[in-house]
From Swiss-Prot:
Transfers a succinyl group from succinyl-CoA to L-homoserine, forming succinyl-L-homoserine. The record marks 196 as: Important for substrate specificity. This is Homoserine O-succinyltransferase. It is found in: Cytoplasm. It comes from Methylobacter tundripaludum (strain ATCC BAA-1195 / DSM 17260 / SV96). GO terms for biological process: methionine biosynthetic process. The keyword Acyltransferase applies. The keyword Membrane does not apply. Keywords: Acyltransferase, Amino-acid biosynthesis, Cytoplasm, Methionine biosynthesis, Transferase. Gene3D superfamilies: 3.40.50.880. Substrate binds at residues 167, 196, 253. Coiled coil: none annotated.
Length: 354
């Protein structure tokens, strides 16, 4: 399902340069196939704003190569933005009002940074709730990533997330708990997913409220679950959209925070991510960081060039398969008219007929 470059968003050109298939509007208009319209509510902070676009666009673009995808990025109020990020949003993003007017077949909601212990205290909570309220009635299926999962579960079912003793950070093995669900058809029964979060919603809480858990890790808990109807909301607690080096960038950021005295302890390694060679490189670098901090010297450059060849990606293929299943089912269920969520005869309370 190739992406259509229906705007001048720089992400399209960046993906072209990486080898992704991107259709121009003229070519797309000559294909007599009902396109799909997918919203991306991007709530990530400025440093990750465009990377998040690319990550989710890649997963969408890697799906079935027949249907065309129009991805519509938008954001909400209540998120702190630099002038540069705000300019990017103003130039390339659509407004929520426009999204509502035109309609969507599917909606992806990213994670976000928080500054309060409870989600309803965040400035973005009310605008996000308005998106939830509209999408639940007007979109065939919503896919939530990490914090968006926690927010929508609290909004819909009243379940508050629990603060973990330590950050769940790294790459963890998961196992399917229901191999028959169409969302996980023909994917690996065991697969890895990156996690990066301080909070969790537990399997027991999800199942108590009727959510169907599809993939679990002994170490990291639930990654994949769906709403009681089986499809209308898909919940990720992990980050299957992450690039190879997303966790590396987070680790580098935490080292800088330590050097600047923004955190007291030196950051631990993300679990199951760095091999022995990388760990030794980073142990040596830690000594230089500590020395520079103590003496007030300038910090040496992070040894990224020595590390990149040792970083393995063990999650993207499964992520692409899940996205392919998700969007394929949406295509089968959604109405021919863009503003309506289901074709005639589909039960919204059991769209998959399970």
């Amino acid at each position: 399902m190739p992406l259509v470059a229906h705007t001048d968003l720089p992400t399209f050109q960046r993906l072209r340069e990486e080898g992704e298939e991107i259709l121009d509007p003229d070519r797309a208009s000559n294909q007599d196939i009902r396109e799909m319209h997918i919203g991306l509510l991007n709530m990530m902070p400025d440093a990750a704003l465009e990377a998040t676009e690319r990550q989710f666009f890649r997963l969408v673009g890697a799906c079935n190569q027949i249907v065309q995808f129009h991805v519509h990025p938008f954001t909400i109020e209540g998120l702190k933005r630099s002038p540069e990020a705000q300019a990017h949003i103003a130039k390339y993003y659509e407004s929520f009002e426009q999204i509502k007017r035109d309609g969507l077949d599917a909606l992806i909601i990213s994670g976000a940074n928080v500054s309060h212990p409870r989600l309803p205290e965040e400035d973005f909570w009310q605008p996000l709730s308005e998106v939830f309220f509209w999408a639940k009635e007007n979109v065939t299926s919503i896919l939530c990533s990490c914090l968006a999962t926690h927010a929508l579960i609290q909004y819909c079912y009243g379940i508050e997330r629990t603060r973990l003793p330590a950050k769940r950070w790294g790459v963890f093995s998961h196992k399917l708990t229901d191999r028959t669900h169409p969302l996980v058809a023909e994917i690996n029964t065991r697969f890895d997913v990156p996690h990066s979060r301080f909070n969790e919603i537990f399997q027991s809480d999800m199942e108590r409220h009727g959510l169907k858990v599809l993939a679990v890790s002994k170490e990291a808990g639930v990654h994949l679950a769906v709403s009681p109807d089986g499809f209308r909301i898909v919940f990720f607690q992990g980050h299957p959209e992450y690039d190879d080096i997303s966790l590396l960038k987070e680790y580098k950021r935490e080292i800088l925070r330590f050097y600047r005295a923004e955190r007291d302890d030196y950051p631990p390694f993300p679990e199951n991510y760095f091999n022995d060679v990388v760990q030794q490189i980073l142990v040596d670098y830690e000594q230089r960081v500590r020395s520079a901090k103590q003496s007030g010297q300038r910090l040496e450059e992070f040894p990224e060039s020595l590390i990149l060849e040792h970083i393995d990606n063990t999650w993207s293929d499964t992520a692409k398969a899940v996205f392919n299943n998700w969007l394929g089912k949406i295509y089968q269920l959604t109405h021919q008219e863009r503003g309506l969520p289901f074709m005639d005869g589909v039960d919204p309370n059991n769209p998959l007929g399970l």
